[in-house]
Structures are given as structure tokens and as C-alpha cells.
């Protein structure tokens, strides 16, 4: 069942996080024992089957205990144009891979990812390839930080 933005009981193991977008999906990986997220991959394209094939490869490689999906919301917390699509994506992940997918508020992660890349000296034209990965990293780090605070 797709979880809400509030973290559930602690889960041990590897976690994959997704920054869902219409054209790209950023992916990050982290280990719950240490609570640290790392950018992993960007899945480009708009067709579902190649996207899910790439996700299946990552799941086969990393054997996650849990999946996290960023939930896009407006600054005031209301639904965004992609909110329903992100929820559907989380349900599709659960149905295809038999893993729990929890939703985490992703407000401002893309802006924060862009700022982090600029601060690291990455040229703006290079952001597109890694920005979504870094946004997924920030989503997963938010999950870890919320879990630790509870």
C-alpha cells in the first residue's frame, strides 16, 4: 500500500528513491542503517516500458527493502499537476515489484538540487543529467531525517 509523507516504522536495508518527472526519473540509493543517500541514476524517456525495465534492473542490482517516491506539491501543500501521476507511479512500483512505496514531500528539492550543483561548480548546461538524481537524493535524505526525528 502506498504510504503517506509521514514515515512508517523503521525499515532495515537498502532503499531506492525516485524523483518522478514526465521526461526523467531521478534515482538515489541509501542504506537505512547509516541514513545517508547518494545519487544513482537518471532514467530518461517518456515511455513506461523502458522506464520500468530500467527500474527493474536497479531493483535486481540493489535489492531494496523499500521504495520512496517524491510527492510534488505546491508551496502551500496543495496538489501539483504531477501529484496524481507521482501517486500512480508509486502504486505501479508496488504492483510490478511487490515492494512498499512510500511518498515523501518533495517541495523545493529540484531547486535545492540545482543550487547544490551550482555550489559544487557544476556548469548549468550539465545540470540536466544529474539534477534529477540529486533531487532523488534529497528526497531520500528527507525520509532518513524524518525517520530519525521520530
Predicted regions located by residue number:
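Phosphate- and other anionic-substrate recognition elements at nucleic-acid/protein interfaces
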Residues: 1-18, 22-150
